[in-house]
Amino acid sequence: MDIIKGNLDGISKPASNSRIRPGSRSSNASLEVLSTEPASCKVDTASNLNSGKEDHSESSNTENRRTSNDDKRESCSEKIKLAEEGSDEDLDLVQRQIIPECSDEHKLEELDSQLQDAIQKMKKLDKILAKTQRREKEIKKQGLEMRIKLWEEIKSAKYSEAWQSKEEMENTKKFLSLTAASEETVGPSHENEDSFSSVFHTQIPPEEYEKQMQKLSKDFTCDVERNESLIKAGKKPFSNTEKIELRGKHNQDFIKRNIELAKESRNPVVMIEREKKRLVELLKDLDEKDSGLSSSEGDQSGWVVPVKGYALAVTQHQQLAEIDIKLQELSAASPAISSFSPRLENQNNQEPDLDGEKNMEVTPGEKVLRNTKEQRDLRIRLREIDEKLRMMKENVLQSTSRLSEEQLKCLLDECIVKQKSIIKLSSEGENEDIEDVIPMFPQLSRSIISKLLNESGTKVQKTEAEDADMLESAEREASKGYYLTKALTGHRMSEALVTEVENMKCLQFSKNDIISDTKDYFMSKTLGIGRLKRPSFLDDPLYGITVSLSSEDQHLKLNSPEKTKADEQETKDAAEECKEP
């Protein structure tokens, strides 16, 4: 085969070697003619799959399909042969036609298989529905049979002696009268009725479907026969319009019924006027039957046996009377309780009347009302007693002298104010004492203090001889009586020593030496006296203070204890004066 025109880039090499003429174009692409074997394999696999899914009953359909597939294959092979003989353009057209035909075949096969599966499922479901419907029908028939037997037994036992009590007879009569309509419906004529409960309101049972179709065909033929003359005259039939009018009437009745129901939607039980009339008729029948039974029997055994209500015993009346007497004795002065006594008398007077009325025949309703009234009166009396007791307690509490809460608060406030004033006075006195004790001395610099120390050192050396002479002369002139008087009278010697220290001004000897000398001297004098007490100068505050005459500060400390002692005495006196009032 020689290539004259066209590009064959998208085509593979040919099966047979092609001869190329020197005048023709040379192309790298080649043409390959495919055989029919792979297509047949694909079709066979698809047919095998479809045959596996289908039942044995559908084998004939598969054979027909195979024949059609074989015909298609043959047509494809013929087209390929023609393409081999023809030109390149013919090959392109043939290939374009072959590809969509094959794809359409596969799609159709898939759709057929899906439809067949769906049909099989529908058949299975139809069988299941038919079984369930048969079962329901059987159960309903059994229920109807049992109901018929029950009604027959009730009717047979209505006038028998099996009913021992009259209440059971009345109940059965009422039950039969209420369910008379349902009893009438149940009968041999209604046993064979088809009680089909449809899932959808438009569903029709399969058994009646053929009957309805026959009826429709008959109606259609009748309408056609009636309207043949009209059809010939060129007029339209009115059978459909008549049917539409009937449906419209039915719909209007339905609308009216809905309107009537909507009017009485507020009522607990929605009923139409027709239903109300029926109910009134049934109730009238029941009232007539009840009146006939009561007149025929003449007994009151059906009524409830009258029972006496709650009544106070004689002892309880006596106890209440005693309580009232005690209350009158306790609160004779109060007018509220005095008004309570006439009620007791009235009630006691009414008691025999009540007893007389009880002997009379009373219906159950009146007795219940009487009992409720008596209970109400008793509750009112108990409330009045509680109120009077509460009033008595309040009077007793008010008679006793008790301070109110406001008075107690005022007293507490006054006490707190007094305590605060005392504390303030004592604190102010202590502060004043401390301020008085603290000396207001001028602060000296270190240079001045050093000068004073140097001057004191020179003066001490000059006065040592004079002091020694003065002490010796004092010891010689002193006598025993003089020192004893000094020891007994007080701390005169201490004052003398203070004056001597002030006069000496910065002597360089320690106070410990002075204290040791004076202590030894006075103790030696006092040991000789048996009954004398400890001298008062030993308790002097100056006796325990260390004196260092090397600095002026220590010299100034000697004057401060005397002032503190005086201040302490003044504070003590002030505190005693505050306590006395």
From Swiss-Prot:
- Please list the residues that carry the modification Phosphoserine: 87
Region annotated Disordered, chain positions: 1-77, 338-370, 553-581
Compositional bias annotation for Polar residues = 14-30
Does Coiled coil appear among the keywords? yes
Q: Which residues form a coiled coil?
A: 103-153
Keywords from the UniProt entry = Coiled coil, Phosphoprotein
Task: Specify whether Ribosomal protein is a keyword of the entry.
Answer: no
**Where does the record place Basic and acidic residues bias?**
52-77
Instruction: Give the InterPro entries listed for this entry.
Output: Fsip1
Q: Which PANTHER family match?
A: FIBROUS SHEATH INTERACTING PROTEIN 1 (PTHR22012), FIBROUS SHEATH-INTERACTING PROTEIN 1 (PTHR22012:SF2)
Task: Report the sequence similarity comment from the record.
Answer: Belongs to the FSIP1 family.
The name on file for this protein is Fibrous sheath-interacting protein 1
Q: What organism is listed for this UniProt entry? A: Macaca fascicularis
